[in-house]
Each structure stands twice: as structure tokens, then as C-alpha cells.
Curated annotation (Swiss-Prot):
UniProt-listed Pfam families: bZIP_1 (PF00170)
Chain intervals with Low complexity compositional bias: 171-194
Region: Leucine-zipper, residue numbers: 289-296
Annotated segments matching region Basic motif: 267-286
Occurrences of domain bZIP (ranges): 264-327
GO MF, one annotated term: DNA-binding transcription factor activity
Residue ranges with Polar residues bias: 229-240
Main location: nucleus
Keyword Protein biosynthesis applies: no
Protein name: BZIP-type transcription factor MBZ1
Superkingdom of origin organism: Eukaryota
Amino acid sequence: MSTSSQTIDVDALLDFSACDGSYNSPSLSPSTASKPTFASPVTAAVSTPSLPSTTQTLSGPSHNYDMYRQQTGFVPGALTNTMAVNQTNNTGYQDFGSLDYLSSFSPENDVFDFNASPSQGTMEMEFESPADSQFFPTVNPSSIQHDTSALSQTSSVGRLWPGAHSQAALAKAQAQQRQQQQQQQLIQQTQRQTSPKSRGKAPQPTDPIVEQKITQLLNSMRAKPASNEPESQSVLNNLPKSKKDEEEMDEDERLLASEEGKKLSSKERRQLRNKVSARAFRSRRKEYISQLEAEIANKVNENGDLRSQNRALMDENKRLSDLTRMLLSSPSFSTFLDNLSANPTGLPQGSPVKIEQNPQQEQNQVPKDVNAYNSQFSSQQQIGMAMIPEQTMDFSLLSLGNTYNFQPQVFVVDTPEVPNAIDASVLSGKTSNFVEESFSSDDEKVEVPVIERPLKTKAIETPEAPVDEEFESDPEFALFHSEPATTTTTPKDIDTENLTGIDLFGGIESEKMFARYELVNATEEEATAAFAMARVQRISASIDSVVSRLELLTMDI
């Protein structure tokens, strides 16, 4: 990874050369030549897309069309380009999800090998993970398009901030660099996996001819990595547009910008502006079409590159499968094939080594109550080391970790009755029955009153006889026609003297009705006297209740 030994200048991150001086003298800042340039921190040399140096600059219309901007929303394609750039650059988020730094650890490589000498134990780790794109310096779009030495001193003001197309080009270049780095790391990882291990294992009879063949194959695979086709450079036509000079204007634009054009009527100026804007729109549309065609060409090239990479990976996979098949067919792996055929599920992680087992250990029966510690420690066995028969230990007999295993138990034997120290009847204002004798009417207060209502008898409906229209309209059966039955109601005899058997009050007893309703025929004076007497009785009744409460409260005094 290449690093710059120079001190980083904050002014080098932003290009303020376009803002120096007035707009009429857009000369380059003399300090740009002395500012340090930072190289992209990439290991592999990648050809970044750049434009050929040219002095041709596109000129825009003389009229300021951005003065009255229409509310048209987003530019077509702006949102997709922005999301693509943010997704590529990981804007605002740290790239903690990539596990590229773990690619050097393969499952076949043991971190600690106690069977080998300390001098042979080498750790193969590569700390060359690609740097995040958020640490890259801000790239000036003018430096991507052409060199600063080839810029014309008469060019107009360029862009201060990079456009969407320049950001997309930069993101594409960075993605290609990361893809090439990942591919190289994948090739190196596969080479490390297929290379014979230098650490010493259990001694096995090796054939020098087979070892020589394996070495030759590995060397040939290292000499023939997956070839990558050169990336095609994408040419973008997103040059900074400058204001048109008077020499490049046509007659209509000169007339519109001159003093004579200001003297024209509003209608003529509107027609002239429409004509100029239509011409500018056609030129911009042509430019957009050319840009889209260039992007389509870039996508086609990228698709071809991906296909070539996929083909290279398929070829590499085929070569690795052939190598594995050839290695397994060699006599050096005969013991491994025998063990694999005998026990296909027990595939070891390292190189196959036959482990000597003591027949006495197989006769040892595992106790039923086995603690989890026993299974955890017994499974950690080093491959390639002779197993020493040991007596398994039941850790459940030690009662470890049972210090705080108590379970408190609480039982209720008896609950004393709480004395009724407060009389609720005294506080409520109602007379209690601790002096007087209790009556049976106190229990009736708890019961819910039942509302009496008269029972409704359902009227019995008599079914009507079916009527046959054909039979009734046929004159041949006129003699058999039935006449409608006439019902006559006979008045019932009512005993007006006693009125027995007649419900006058709708199911309510007459005693209750007479007790509630009383017919009084009196004058106004008698009525007022009766009302006053009733009020006096009501007040005296309330006074009696208050007096009784006071007597109850002052009884013990």
C-alpha cells in the first residue's frame, strides 16, 4: 500500500482555483503546481479512466436560462446515479461488514501446532485490506478530465463541485480497483490452500516422483493466473461548459445580447428567446444522447469484463478440481481414502493422519450423568499426536458452582383475625345494630330488586286457507265456490258494580296503585298547607338522623 510521506494540506482537498480573481480572468492559481498530489492507496496498478488532453471546450448559450427555473423535480437519472455513488462510497457508514482481513486464515491452517518445532511455525497473514473510499481525498473533476498543464489560459470558470457523471466515473474506477484486489487475494488464497504444508506432521512414506509432479503443477498454476482483460476507458463528455464568446454566437444570440435587442418589443424578444432556447435544447439533447450512448458502451464493456472474469474463475475451479482428483488418486493419500470410505462423516480439517486408539478406551462406558465440562474438554484433541488413554472424570460429582443454589421455601401456618376496630356504619351515618336487635329486613337490602311487569300473551295466528286461482276462475266449478266466512263479535257482559276479573292497572295490584296515587280535591290554601306540612316532616326526619348520629358519637363520653 503506497503512502505519501508529505504533509497533507487541507487546501489540496478542494480546488478553489475557479474562485480566484474575477470571472473575466480565470487564470489558474499559481499554488496548484506546488501542492502535493496524493496517489490512490491501491496495491495493483489500475488504469483510471481519463480523457485525452484537448483544448476544445464546449460553450453554453449566452442567455441565462437558469434565471426562471421551472419546478420539474429531479433531473432524469440523477437519483439513481446519486444512490449508486453513495452505495459505492459507503457515504456516512463505516465498512465493518467486510471480512477481507480474515481471508488469510484458511480452515486447513492451524494457528497453533504443538507437533512442529517453533522455528517452523510461521504465521501467514496479509494486512493489505483495501482502504475505505471515505479516506480518499476529494478528486477535482478537472484533474480527471485533462491535465492542468494542457488547460488554456483563456478558458472560463469551471465547476467547483464534481458532477454526477464524474462521481460515477470515479466510483466505477474504485470499484474496478477493489474487484482486482479481491481477485488477486482469492488467487493467492487458493494457491495457499493447494500448496503443501511446510509444517511437519506425522511421518508418512512419500513418493519423490509424486511430490515432484505436485510441485510442478503448483508452479504452473502460479505462473498461469487468471488473465484479466484490460479495462476499457470510459470517455465522458461532461466537460465544464463556459459562457459563449461573442465570436461563437450566432446572429440571433448576438442580437439578443446587444443593445439593439433590448430595444425590440417584448413579443419580438420572446420569439427570439424561444428560437435561441430551441436551438440550445436541440444541442443539449444531442449531447445527452451521446452521453447515454457512451454509458451504454461502458456497461457493455463492463459486462464483457465480468463474463471474462467468470470464465476465468470457472477455468480455475476446473483446474483445482482436476488437481484435487489427481492428488487423491496418488498413493500418498491411500490412507486418507481408506479412512474416508470407512467413515465418510468424520472428515478431518487438517492432513489425514491415522490416530492410534487404545482398545481399552473403547471398553470404558460413559456415565449417564455427564457434565457439560466433560464433553467440552474431551472433544479438544490435537490431530497428529498420539492419544494417551485417560480415565474420564465426572465433573458433576464435584458440585461446582452450587454455592448460591439455595431455594427458600415459605409456609403459612395460621393467619390471625384482624379485629374490627372501626365501625363503618358509624362513619357512613347509618344506624348500626350493635344496640338494637337485628331484623331480617337487613338481608333484603343486599338483594337486587326485581321489576314486575305484565306478561305479554302472544296472539294465536290462524293459518289462512290456500286459494287456487284457476279453480276459483273456472265457471264449471261455480257451485263449489266457498264463500268467505263472516265473523261476528258478541259483546261480553261486564260487571260494572264489582269490576271483578278486569285488569284495570295493567297487572299491577290495586293496593299498590291506591297507595301511590291519591286523589285530593282541595283548594289552593289547603294545598299550600299540605306542602308546608310535608316540608316540615322532611326536615324533622333529617334532623332526627343527625341527632341519632350525634348520640352514637357521644355515647362513650
